[in-house]
Amino acid sequence: MHVITRLWDRVSGSQPLPPGWLIVVTAVAALLIVANTGTWRPAGKVITIAHEGGHALVSVLSGRRLDGIRLHRDSSGVTYSRGKRTGPGLVLTAAAGYVMPSLLGAGAALLLAQRHLTAMLWLALVLLAATFLAIRNVFGAVAVLATAGAVFVVSYYAPPEVQAGFAYLAVWFLLFGGIRPVLELARGRSRSRNWARASDADQLAQMTGVPAGLWVALFGLVAVLALAGGATLLAPAGWHA
């Protein structure tokens, strides 16, 4: 019981804000990781986990039956769910993928701004554990376990300074990383009809009658607004207008 109490106090307590230079350095590092193809290729799988996890979470919340998630080496993925073939539940499930990394980043930024750094890391572990239970292929299981393992090691064993750097880097990465897949979606749709037919935006267009281009624009708007809001929350003290 004493161990549980100590753990709860650690998770629910507040931590001091890191120095401004660390916030700026982690923002620049995250932007470089997202912008560089060589680093994006492995790191982008974290965005795929968030993307497919978004489909899965909303499918369950909307009353659909989740059958599983598969993650692939090329950073693509697919989420299987069953339920009504029409209606808001299916639309929300399809729309959740591209916006989820950005929304998670904005939510995590709010926790960091409230000095709940440890809570943010442990909440990430809970979400990764839930995602792992839905994974249905070996590569997906390895990807989620590797991500969760890194979060656990840092949150449990690393000193506060390292935890802060890791947490801020992760949040900036979600915020910046939520934009790149939308840009890739827009570029891919303009180049390939096969991509267009298979994309979330085009599936949403078939469900709703709203043009796929407008769905892509909506995904982009959410990502940009989340980045703007998250950056405002994370900005070092004295930088706010």
Regions found by a protein language model. Give the residues of each.
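Membrane-helix interface "capping/anchor" motifs
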Residues: 39-40, 113-117, 133-144, 158-163
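Membrane-interface loop-to-helix entry segments
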Residues: 18, 91-101, 139-142, 214-218
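Short, strongly hydrophobic alpha-helical membrane anchors
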Residues: 1-17, 237-241
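Structural signature of hydrophobic alpha-helical transmembrane segments
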Residues: 108-125
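Hydrophobic core of alpha-helical transmembrane segments in multi-pass integral membrane proteins
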Residues: 22-35, 124-132, 144-154, 223-230
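C-terminal membrane-associated helical module and adjoining short loops/tails
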Residues: 142-241
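Small-residue-rich helix-interface/hinge motifs
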Residues: 36-90
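Divalent metal-coordination and catalytic microenvironments
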Residues: 51-53, 97, 204
